[in-house]
């Protein structure tokens, strides 16, 4: 009884937001409009989010747009920097991996800011697959759905993630660590110690992509040590989740697979 009470008390005191940027893929390879996009996996128990589990794909150009919007709406609050553009692509896999790390660091910092976390465009960016024009229309009230409805609709269409995530957890290597885990202590309460790793993993496994209609919370996040996290599963691509350090994949048929040529990717990196 004491252990269960302590777990409930700790869960009530702390909110956690976990974000991972992984699985870079080259889209439209060989064409003039080829580009690289990245899978963004988010898992949380925070009331700031409508859906507790989400997984979307975004390209670098969309990150650039997001930062501009956050900067415009944040006033004097500083917005984290994005990884810079590059004009030389001698080692494409190395460049993509460095960019992936930079994008993840950007999101980690953004999610630690209460002001930035309150921006509806950030939530649509992370928890829906709406395009940039569709996001702008939605937040301006010109879309077919509200912000919450758009997120709920996308979450319901991908509700099979929960079962897959729980299955993936049992196969994680012991050394696999979270790339980002932000705990948000509730204001006005004394923060209690975090639970042991085994208890925290059990809590992660029981989280389902349930939807929360409550408004954003006002807690300030602090970054704590990492722990185990299930890999993200994309229903459109049912293969197993990839390691975050795995080189970019080509979004082409198996009989067309082959090594990527740097000249083919000249138009991809900054889009």
Curated annotation (Swiss-Prot):
Its main location: membrane. It is a peripheral membrane protein. Transmembrane segments: none annotated. Pfam families: PX. GO terms for biological process: intracellular protein transport; vesicle organization. A 1,2-diacyl-sn-glycero-3-phospho-(1D-myo-inositol-3-phosphate) binds at residues 59, 85, 99. Residues 135-139 are annotated as: Important for membrane trafficking. It comes from the Eukaryota. GO terms for cellular component: cytoplasm; endosome; plasma membrane. Residues 185-271 are annotated as: Disordered. InterPro entries: PX_dom, PX_dom_sf, SNX10/11. Keywords: Cell membrane, Cytoplasm, Endosome, Lipid-binding, Membrane, Protein transport, Transport. It is found in: Cell membrane; Endosome; Cytoplasm. Residues 213-230 have a biased composition (Low complexity). Gene3D superfamilies: Phox-like domain. Residues 16-132 form the PX domain. Belongs to the sorting nexin family. The PX domain mediates interaction with membranes enriched in phosphatidylinositol 3-phosphate. This is Sorting nexin-11. The lineage of its organism: Eukaryota, Metazoa, Chordata, Craniata, Vertebrata.
């Amino acid at each position: 009884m004491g252990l269960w009470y302590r777990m409930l008390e700790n869960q009530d005191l702390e909110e956690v937001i976990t974000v991972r940027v992984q699985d870079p893929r080259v889209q439209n390879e060989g064409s003039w409009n080829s580009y690289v996009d990245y899978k963004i996996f988010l898992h949380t128990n925070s009331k700031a989010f409508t859906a507790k589990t989400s997984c979307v794909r975004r390209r670098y150009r969309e990150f650039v747009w997001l930062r501009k919007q956050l900067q415009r709406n944040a006033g004097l609050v500083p917005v984290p920097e994005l990884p810079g553009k590059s004009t030389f692509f001698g080692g494409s896999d190395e460049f993509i991996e460095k960019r992936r790390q930079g994008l993840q660091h950007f999101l980690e910092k953004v999610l630690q800011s209460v002001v930035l976390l309150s921006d509806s465009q950030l939530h649509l960016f992370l928890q829906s697959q709406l395009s940039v024009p569709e996001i702008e229309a939605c937040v301006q009230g010109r879309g077919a759905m509200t912000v919450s409805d758009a997120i709920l609709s996308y979450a319901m269409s991908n509700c099979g993630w929960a079962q897959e995530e729980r299955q993936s957890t049992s196969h994680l290597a012991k050394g696999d660590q979270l790339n980002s885990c932000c705990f948000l202590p509730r204001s006005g309460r004394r923060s209690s110690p975090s639970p042991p790793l085994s208890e925290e993993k059990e809590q992660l496994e029981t989280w389902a992509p349930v939807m929360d209609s409550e408004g954003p919370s006002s807690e300030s996040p602090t970054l704590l040590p990492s722990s185990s996290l299930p890999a993200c599963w994309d229903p459109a691509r049912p293969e197993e989740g990839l390691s975050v350090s795995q080189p970019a994949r080509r979004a082409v048929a198996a009989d067309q697979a082959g090594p990527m040529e740097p000249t083919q990717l000249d138009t991809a990196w900054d889009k």
